[in-house]
Design a protein with these regions (language model features):
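Glycan-processing catalytic domains of CAZymes
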Residues: 14-16, 47-340
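Intrinsically disordered, low-complexity terminal tails of fungal membrane proteins
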Residues: 1-16
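Alpha-helical transmembrane segments in eukaryotic/viral proteins
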Residues: 16-47
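Extracellular Ser/Thr-rich, low-complexity/disordered mucin-like segments
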Residues: 6-9, 42-50
Length: 340
């Protein structure tokens, strides 16, 4: 006697709809996870990730101005420079690096009228409680306090809120007429940041900053962060380096010179102490200048010797000592950066 197989029960419409909905949810979750990972530009939860050192593609935008190797410069962040009606500046240099927030547009206009170019400094990788946009940062954006800098904290570089803040800062630079920007503290991965930032996070962040800056026709620099140079060199137009002689790392930054891009190099021979009056008047000794101006790997750098306060005092490698007047009634929050 044969037995007929039991026929399979046909799927009800309800079961089909439930299964289809489940599949759709899984696909959506995967898509959101992938998209979020791409947007954040890297993981924030592994300090030991190896940086992606494959050079990023060069931007297609051609800029009106980029600095040249050997360009002379002055950096004044303690207060805005006081620009008089004289036909030149003190010192008579090509570029001034000034604080974005503290420097009025009128000062930048005056520098332009004297034939100078202006690079505007801001901290891209930290929260500073005294800045006018400090209220825009969210608690989740913030990490540990920078060692030695009360009121300043590392930030999560992949945060969309943080990136929006930096976009507005770059737009402020354009509105003020800055020719370039000097975004600082992009090397949080080298410090105890409390956010598990990696080199890949910094690389992705620099790519984002470039995508905002270049369409606004401004050049952009890399501040320190020597270990990511090979990846981001195509994105940036210059380096601003602090203390590569002191830390024996100038050879890393020589890659900029090899690529035809300048290195604006700062050394602080007196450390964080006050300069003696004789040094302020006459400059450092010849031996000190030789040490900080002719170090291994620094050939072609545009070197200045400065106080840690980054006020108007500067000495050049030829022994010239110059003092830029400052507007002490304006600003006063800019300060030097070298977090170790």
């Amino acid at each position: 006697m044969s037995t007929k197989p039991t026929p399979k029960r046909p799927w009800s419409l309800r079961r089909k709809l439930l299964l289809g909905g489940l599949i759709a949810l899984i696909v959506l979750a995967l898509a959101l996870g992938l998209g979020l990972g791409l947007t954040l530009g890297g993981s924030d939860d592994n300090d030991n990730d190896s940086p992606t050192l494959t050079p990023l593609p060069s931007p297609n935008t051609t800029l009106t101005w980029t600095p040249k190797v050997g360009d002379s410069w002055q950096i004044v962040l303690s207060h805005p420079p006081a620009i008089s009606s004289t036909p030149s500046t003190t010192p008579n240099v090509t570029i001034f690096d000034v604080d974005l927030f503290d420097t009025p547009k009128a000062t930048i206009d005056s520098l332009h009228a004297l034939g100078r170019k202006v690079i505007c400094y801001f901290s891209a990788g930290s929260y500073e409680e005294w800045r006018t946009d400090a209220q825009d940062f969210k608690p989740d954006d913030l990490g540990k306090e920078l060692d030695g800098w009360p009121g300043e904290k590392w930030v999560r570089l992949g945060s969309q809120n943080l990136r929006g803040i930096m976009k507005r800062r770059i737009e402020m630079a354009r509105e003020k007429g800055c020719d370039g920007v000097d975004p600082d503290n992009v090397d949080g991965y080298q410090n105890d940041n409390g956010l598990s930032l990696t080199a890949n996070d910094s690389i992705a962040f620099m790519q984002y900053l470039s995508s905002v800056t270049r369409p606004l026709n401004m050049s952009m620099g890399l501040k320190n962060a020597g270990s990511i140079i090979s990846a981001v060199l195509p994105l940036v137009d210059f380096s601003v380096n602090e203390q590569c002689i002191q830390y024996n790392e100038c050879s890393k930054f020589a890659a900029f010179i090899d690529a035809g891009k300048p290195v604006f190099h700062i050394e602080y021979p007196a450390g964080d102490g006050d300069l003696q009056q004789s040094v302020e008047s006459n400059g450092f000794s010849e031996d000190t200048r030789k040490k900080f101006c002719n170090g291994e790997g620094s050939k072609g750098f545009s070197t200045v010797l400065k106080k840690m306060s980054l006020d108007g005092w500067v000495e050049y490698c030829d022994g010239r000592v110059e003092v830029t007047g400052i507007d002490s009634g304006t600003g006063g929050h800019g300060k030097p950066r070298k977090v170790r």
